[in-house]
């Protein structure tokens, strides 16, 4: 039984690690990194700044996922974020969870 539990814990840990590593790759694949970086403001805000601004907000994930897909303006300055029709709802939520985890 102990062996089964150990294998289960290791499997879950490995899958979680792979998912965490995949999110920067997804951000690159969906062209997020053309305007954003983790720590530095480019055209759009740094992901760490987004995470800080929305920390603790219950609706942050849904609000940001909608902005990823539909675009938005006025939150971070004069340059609007364009819509991203190439990003699915599931991908938007995956990306936003990763962005909100940046600290």
What are these regions (language model features)?
Residues 57-66:
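Post-signal/leader-peptide non-cytosolic segments of secretory proteins
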Residues 1-8:
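Bacterial N-terminal signal peptides that target proteins for export
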Residues 34, 42-54, 67-96:
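Axial heme c-ligation environment in periplasmic c-type cytochrome domains
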Residues 21-38:
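Sequence/structural segment immediately N-terminal to covalent heme-attachment motifs in c-type
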Residues 11-12:
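Repetitive helical segments and hydrophobic/amphipathic motifs
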């Amino acid at each position: 039984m102990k062996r089964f539990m150990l294998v289960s814990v290791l499997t879950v840990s490995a899958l979680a690690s792979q998912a965490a590593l995949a999110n920067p790759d997804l951000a690159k694949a969906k062209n997020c990194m053309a305007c954003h970086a983790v720590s530095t403001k480019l055209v759009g805000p740094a992901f760490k700044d987004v995470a800080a601004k929305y920390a603790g907000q219950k609706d942050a994930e849904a609000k940001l996922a909608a902005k990823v897909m539909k675009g938005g303006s006025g939150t971070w300055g004069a340059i609007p974020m364009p819509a991203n029709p190439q990003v699915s709802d599931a991908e938007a939520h995956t990306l936003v969870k990763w962005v909100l985890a940046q600290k």
